Amino acid sequence: MMQFKNVLAAAALALGVSVPAVAQTAEDDGLDYKPYPHMFVGVQGGAQTTFTNYDNLKLITPTASVSFGAFFTPVVGARLHFNGWQNKGGFKDATQDFKYDYKYATSDLDLMLNLSTLFGKKNYYPLNVYLIGGIGLNYACDNDDAYANKNLMPLAYKNDRLSHNARVGAMLDWNLMKNLSLNLEVNANSLGDRYNSKTNGK
């Protein structure tokens, strides 16, 4: 079993839009369409940071994602989520202090639970809170800056690297109209140490 000290945590905050595909059947909630079940496509953009002993504010980078999913019931949904762009790492010891850049892409299969309908009395609310959890794979590349300092970071990789990704998060989603919603999502991701070429102690 992997110990906590060997796990890297990364967090992301993203603002996005979703485009649901819904049926045209009238419902008791006063809508002229049936909100569930439905499929959706989502796009997001935001910022992320990696939690190590280095200053997290200096490691903030842009992130973007696209997702394809469905809600099977008013409570339970799932999505295939693709996320990536840029990332930064930082190394600091008694004599060295520097940052390095690399790129990444992550794919996750996420379970989505609608807490608003789970604990509410209706099957539809214009404002919903989702709990998200998932697993997937992370791909990192263009790690030349870190590899150039391999004498200081023995875990630095030359070409590319695959890692597990485990995610937990929450989303606030506002249904603006029949086929458009606006959302704000925050999530935390667990990856292996080699993702950023070092252990958490550096």
Can you describe what each PLM-predicted range is?
Residues 25-38, 75, 117-129, 176-179:
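Short loop/turn motifs that connect adjacent beta-strands in outer-membrane beta-barrel proteins
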Residues 53-60, 89-98, 141-153, 194-201:
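Outer-membrane beta-barrel translocator domains and adjoining extracellular loop/strand segments
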Residues 89-93, 102-104, 177-202:
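Predominantly the C-terminal beta-signal and adjacent terminal strand-loop region
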